[in-house]
C-alpha cells in the first residue's frame, strides 16, 4: 500500500444527500432556501450591530463575528452542492477537496472558540457587572478574535498536512455533500491510524477546552443568578444567556456525534444528517435564536429593515 501513488485518484465524486432525481430537486430548493435565509439573517445581524450605536458592546461584537463566520461556513459547503446540481456534475479535485475541508474545519473551530468567548462575556457581565467595562475593553475583544483566527488556522493546517500525503487508490466516491475528514479517511488506502488519533486527541482538546470554559462560566452564572432576590432579575439574567445556551447545545451535540467516535462505528447516513445540522441548519437558526428574545437586537433589526424598505 505504501508504494501506491496518491495521484491515482486526482478527483472525487460528491454523491450528495440523495441519488433520486425527484429528491434531488426538492433538496436543491430546500438547501437554496436555507442558504439564502442564512446569508440574509446573519447579514442583518452584522448590519444591525454596525449601524446601531447602542449595540457597540462586546456581546454584540462577538455576535456579529459569529454571524460573519456562519455566513462563510455556509458559503464553504452549500454553493458547491447547488452548483453540482445545476451543472449535473459531482466531481471535485483533490486540491479542491482539501481546500474545502480546510475551510470547513477552520469555521467549525471559529464557531467553537467564539461560543466560548461569548460565554465568558456573559460570565463577566452577570458575575462582575461593576468591572465589565474595565475587563471587556474593545482592544481586548479585538485581540481575542484575532487570536482565535490564528489558533483556528494553525489547528486546521495540522489536519490538512496530515491528510495531504494519504493515498487514494481506487474508490473515489464520497457519500457526502462536501469533503469531510471522516469519509475521506474511509476511502484512503493508506494507514490512517495517526489521523484518527490526532482527530480524537488534539481535536478533542480543541473542542473540549472551550466547552469546559462554557460549562464553568454558566455554573458561576447560575450560582450568581440564584442569589438574586428578585424573580424578575433572575429571569432577565437567564433569558440573556438562554439563546446562547441553545446554540451551544445544538452545535456541540452534532459535532460530538460526527467526529468523536471510532471510525469503524460511523454510519454514513447518520453522519451526513448530523453534519447537515451543524453546517447548514445551525448557521441559519443562529440569527433567529439570538434575536428572538432580545428586544435591543429586534429593535435594531426593525430599523435596518425599515431603511432598506424605504430606500427601495
UniProtKB/Swiss-Prot annotation:
Q: Which UniProt keywords apply?
A: Cell membrane, Disulfide bond, G-protein coupled receptor, Glycoprotein, Membrane, Olfaction, Receptor, Sensory transduction, Transducer, Transmembrane, Transmembrane helix
What are the recorded Gene Ontology BP terms?
signal transduction
Gene3D superfamilies membership = Rhodopsin 7-helix transmembrane proteins
The places in or outside the cell where this protein is found are: Cell membrane
Q: Origin, by domain of life?
A: Eukaryota
Per the record, GO CC terms?
plasma membrane
Its source organism is Homo sapiens
Q: What residue ranges lie in the Extracellular compartment?
A: 1-25, 80-100, 159-196, 260-272
Query: What name is this protein filed under?
Result: Olfactory receptor 1F1
The segments annotated as topological domain Cytoplasmic are 50-57, 121-139, 220-236, 293-312
Please give the family membership noted in the entry: Belongs to the G-protein coupled receptor 1 family.
Glycosylation sites noted in the Swiss-Prot or TrEMBL record: 5
Give TM regions: 26-49, 58-79, 101-120, 140-158, 197-219, 237-259, 273-292
Say what the protein does.
Odorant receptor.
Membrane-topology annotation of the record: Multi-pass membrane protein
Here the disulfide bonds are 97-189
Major place of residence: membrane
One GO term in the molecular function aspect is: olfactory receptor activity
- The secretion signal range is none
Q: Which InterPro entries match?
A: GPCR_Rhodpsn, GPCR_Rhodpsn_7TM, Olfact_rcpt
